[in-house]
Regions:
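Negatively charged, low-complexity tracts enriched in Asp/Glu with abundant Ser/Thr
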Residues: 1-61
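Short N-terminal micro-motifs specific to bacterial/archaeal maturation
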Residues: 33, 88-89
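Conserved aromatic
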Residues: 36, 91-92
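Amphipathic alpha-helical interaction surfaces
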Residues: 48, 52, 73-77, 103, ...
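Short aromatic-glycine-(Arg/Gly/Cys) micro-motifs in beta-strand/loop hairpins
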Residues: 59-87
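A short, charged, amphipathic alpha-helix used as a generic interaction element across diverse proteins
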Residues: 92-105
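Intrinsically disordered, low-complexity charged/polar segments
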Residues: 110-122
């Protein structure tokens, strides 16, 4: 199983465990190689199991974190939004939009974890 497949399964594992998203991302290996996660690879993983995309979309519609990313569907278009700076992109394809959101969302969580780890080392 590659990194994109492991990341794609995070919401499902989260729902059936008592582990945090940060802990699950660490278990996937993402924190050691965040650059290895690409939109194309995530989109392929979602094509293999489209139900995972639905879990991510549900999670993304719940996100209103300062600095984080969210996703919503309006009139058949998906808006991926940064709550840090208002940047956004709009996609029509559901799986591609979801993949774009996932890469940005886990990137944000990964950066928060790295900042926390650096602060603890001081």
């Amino acid at each position: 199983m590659n990194l994109a497949q492991r990341i794609s399964e995070v919401p499902d594992i989260y729902e059936h465990s008592n582990r945090s998203t940060a802990a699950l991302l660490k278990e996937t290996g993402y924190l050691e190689a965040p650059q290895a996660l690409t939109v194309g690879d995530v989109e392929e993983a979602l094509e293999q199991d489209p139900n995972l995309a639905e879990l991510w979309l549900e999670r993304g519609m719940d996100q209103r974190l300062a600095g984080g990313w969210g996703i919503e569907c309006v009139h058949g278009q998906y808006r991926i939004q940064s709550y840090a700076n208002g940047r956004h992109l709009v996609e029509k394809d559901r799986l591609h939009a979801c993949a774009e959101f996932i890469v940005r969302y886990v990137g944000f969580i990964g950066e928060v974890v790295r900042r926390h780890q650096r602060a603890r080392m001081r």
